[in-house]
């Protein structure tokens, strides 16, 4: 009888050990599941942050050149900013902001998407080029230059709106349209700014102008120039 009792006791101890072992396995499995889920979330977050960082570092716009249009020796009425995107993701110019500041004022300009279905404030010159980037082009409904132009015609733009238009110089995949003016690496466009109408008066001589062309994400293009003492020619290199 004693021998049978000892056998039963050993069996009970073995079952208890097995239960403890199973419990440990279950706890370890739950812990492993939590760790795996956490690692997955952290990996996803790291990938998103890495992608956003890449966009901020690699993407953006660079100001290649700035040219002005003078009406006489002392007055500048238009500015054309030649921009091109950096290597990186495409840039939507519809969400791009152009800032200007002088000694006594600062302004922010947005893309003029009015009448976008008919081309908006975009003039395409990629096919045949253009004889005059500052010319108001009524072939494209309103043309790239906002506001009234007494020389070449008129637009229905409200002078109180701070807007810019676009002249397309190079766009191999036709990504720049009135509704979605999107540029990618290799594209070149002019941001058409009728500065005289926006400010309310033409820009005089020896005026320091600073600003940025700020895309939705990525590095901004820098604007920094001083207008010359005299506008000797109708077309003036500013930066």
UniProtKB/Swiss-Prot annotation:
User: Pfam families, per this entry?
Assistant: Arch_flagellin (PF01917)
Q: Which UniProt keywords apply?
A: Archaeal flagellum, Glycoprotein
TM stretches of this protein: none
Give the subcellular location: Archaeal flagellum
Q: Does the keyword Acyltransferase apply?
A: no
User: Which residue spans adopt a coiled-coil conformation according to this UniProt entry?
Assistant: none
In this entry the propeptide is located at 1-11
GO function terms (MF aspect): structural molecule activity
**GO BP annotations, alphabetical order:** archaeal or bacterial-type flagellum-dependent cell motility
* Glycan-bearing residues: 115, 128
How this protein is processed and modified after translation, per its record?
A: N-linked glycans consist of the 779 Da trisaccharide beta-ManNAc(Thr)-(1-4)-beta-GlcNAc3NAcA-(1-3)-beta-GlcNAc.
**In terms of domain of life, where is this protein from?**
Archaea
InterPro entries xrefs: Flagellin/pilin_N_arc, Flagellin_arc
The entry's cellular-component GO terms read: archaeal-type flagellum
Spell out the family assignment given in the record's similarity comment: Belongs to the archaeal flagellin family.
Give the PANTHER family listed for this entry.
FLAGELLIN B1 (PTHR35903:SF1)
Free-text function comment from the UniProt entry: Flagellin is the subunit protein which polymerizes to form the filaments of archaeal flagella.
Q: What is this protein called?
A: Flagellin B3
Gene source species: Methanococcus voltae
Identify the coding gene: flaB3
């Amino acid at each position: 009888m004693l021998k049978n009792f000892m056998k039963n006791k050993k069996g009970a101890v073995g079952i208890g050990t097995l239960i403890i072992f199973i419990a440990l396995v279950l706890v370890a499995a739950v812990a492993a599941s939590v760790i795996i889920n956490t690692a997955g979330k952290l990996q996803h977050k790291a990938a998103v942050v890495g992608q956003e960082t890449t966009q901020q570092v690699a993407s953006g716009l660079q100001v290649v050149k700035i040219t002005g249009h003078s009406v006489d020796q002392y007055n500048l009425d238009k500015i054309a900013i030649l921009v091109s995107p950096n290597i990186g993701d495409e840039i939507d110019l519809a969400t791009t902001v152009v800032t200007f500041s002088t000694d006594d004022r600062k302004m922010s300009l947005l893309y003029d998407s009015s009448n976008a279905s008919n081309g908006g404030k975009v003039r395409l010159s990629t096919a045949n080029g253009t004889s005059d980037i500052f010319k108001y082009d009524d072939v494209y409904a309103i043309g790239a230059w906002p506001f009234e132009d007494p020389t070449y015609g008129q637009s229905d733009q409200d002078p109180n709106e701070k807007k810019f238009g676009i002249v397309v110089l190079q766009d191999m995949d036709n990504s720049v349209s009135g509704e979605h003016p999107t540029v990618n690496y290799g594209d070149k466009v002019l941001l058409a700014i009728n500065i005289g109408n926006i400010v309310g008066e033409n820009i005089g001589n020896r005026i320091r102008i600073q600003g940025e062309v700020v895309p939705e994400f990525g590095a901004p293009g820098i604007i920094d120039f001083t207008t010359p003492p005299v506008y000797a020619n109708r077309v003036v290199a500013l930066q």
